[in-house]
Design a protein with these regions (language model features):
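Glycine-rich phosphate- or other oxyanion-binding loops that anchor nucleotides, phosphorylated ligands
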Residues: 55-57, 63-91, 98-99, 144, ...
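Acidic/glycine-enriched edge-of-secondary-structure segments
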Residues: 49-65, 194-209
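A general structural signal for well-ordered alpha-helical segments in protein cores
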Residues: 45-48, 69, 127
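N-terminal glycine-rich anion-binding loop in soluble enzyme alpha/beta folds
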Residues: 4-63
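Mixed-charge interfacial surface used for oligomerization/domain docking
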Residues: 10-24, 28-29, 83, 92, ...
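A short, ordered amphipathic alpha-helix with a cationic face
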Residues: 38, 116-119
Length: 286
C-alpha cells in the first residue's frame, strides 16, 4: 500500500475534502468561553467565527497531545499503511510538530515529519502537492525530498481587519497594532520562512489599497511561476475577497478554491480577515 498523508487542521483542508483526497487530519483544540473543542470536528469554521465575533473573551488554541498523535498513527497503521508523511504547521507557532516527532521516533509506522514553516492555505497546498506525487506513483523518499525543496515557495499572505488577536495571542508586536490604529492603516502580514516570525509586509489605507499592495507580491510570483495554485480563505472579508478575485483576473494560475479559514488560524487573525496562499503545482514527469 502507498504511504499515507497526514496533516493538522491548520492546513484548513475541510473534512469533506480530506475524505475525498484520502488525507488524514489531526485536529488542534480551540478553547472558547471555557469550552475545549476540536477544530472542524466538534465545531465548523463558520460556527466558530460567528461565536468568536459575539464573545467577550479572547479564545485560544492548543496543539494535539502526544497521545492523540499516537492514536492517529495507530489508526493509519491499522488501515494498512507502513509509512506516512506528516506536514505540520510552523513549529514556532505550536508544539504540534514536536509532539508528532516525539511519537514518530518510536512508532512502528515510518512517519516523515515535515515542518511546513507556514499554515492555513499554504500548508494545505503543500499537502495537496504531496498527494499529487503519491497519485503519480512517486516514492515516499521522492515525495519527502520534493516537499522539503518546495517549502520556500509556499506563501501565505494574511490581511486581518485589525492586529488585535495576533497581538493578544503573542503573534505580533503591540507597537505595530497601536501604530496602525493611530495612523488608520491596515497591515498585511506573512510568516518569515526561516524564523517563523509573523512580519508586516505591506501597509495601506482601506481595503482597495491594502489588497492591491499585497497582491503585487502574488502577481509577481505568478509571473515567475505560471500555473501555480492560488487559494483564498476568509473569516468574512467579502470586499477583500472580491478585490483579490479582480486582481487575479487574467492571470496564469490554477484556482485551488475558496472557503473559510479554519478555527485555529481564525483565532489568531480574527473576524473579517483574508488569507491568500500560493504555491507551485506538482508537474508529473510524463
Amino acid at each position: 500500500m502507498s504511504f499515507a498523508i497526514i496533516t493538522d487542521s491548520t492546513s484548513d483542508i475541510s473534512p469533506a475534502s480530506a475524505q475525498e483526497l484520502g488525507i488524514y487530519v489531526i485536529p488542534l483544540h480551540v478553547i472558547i468561553e471555557g469550552e475545549d473543542l476540536l477544530d472542524q470536528v466538534q465545531i465548523t469554521a463558520q460556527e466558530y467565527v460567528a461565536r468568536m465575533a459575539g464573545s467577550e473573551q479572547l479564545p485560544h488554541t492548543s496543539q494535539p497531545s502526544a497521545g492523540e498523535f499516537k492514536a492517529l498513527f495507530d489508526r493509519v497503521r491499522a488501515d494498512g499503511h507502513d509509512s506516512a508523511i506528516f506536514i505540520s504547521l510552523c513549529s514556532e507557532w505550536s508544539a504540534c510538530y514536536s509532539n508528532a516527532c516525539l511519537v514518530a521516533e518510536t512508532h512502528e509506522l515510518d512517519v516523515r515529519c515535515i515542518d511546513s514553516r507556514t499554515g492555513s492555505g499554504a500548508e494545505g497546498l503543500l499537502v495537496e502537492y504531496a498527494r499529487a506525487m503519491r497519485e503519480d506513483g512517486r516514492s515516499l523518499d521522492e515525495t519527502e525530498a520534493q516537499i522539503r525543496a518546495t517549502l520556500p515557495d509556499a506563501h501565505l499572505l494574511l490581511i486581518p481587519r485589525t492586529l488585535e488577536n495576533l497581538v493578544k495571542n503573542g503573534r505580533a508586536p503591540k507597537l505595530a497594532s497601536q501604530l496602525t490604529q493611530m495612523l488608520n492603516i491596515r497591515l498585511a502580514v506573512s510568516p518569515e520562512w526561516k524564523s517563523g516570525e509573523i512580519k508586516a509586509i505591506k501597509k495601506g489605507r482601506g481595503a482597495k489599497r491594502i489588497v492591491a499592495n499585497t497582491m503585487a507580491d502574488c502577481l509577481a510570483f505568478l509571473a515567475e511561476h505560471p500555473g501555480s495554485s492560488v487559494r483564498v480563505l476568509t473569516t468574512g472579508a467579502a470586499e477583500e475577497q472580491e478585490l483579490v478575485s479582480q486582481a487575479l483576473a487574467g492571470q496564469d494560475y490554477v484556482d485551488a478554491g475558496t472557503g473559510p479559514i479554519g478555527c485555529t488560524i481564525a483565532t489568531h487573525v480574527g473576524v473579517d480577515a483574508i488569507a491568500i496562499s500560493y504555491c507551485p503545482r506538482y508537474q508529473p514527469a510524463n
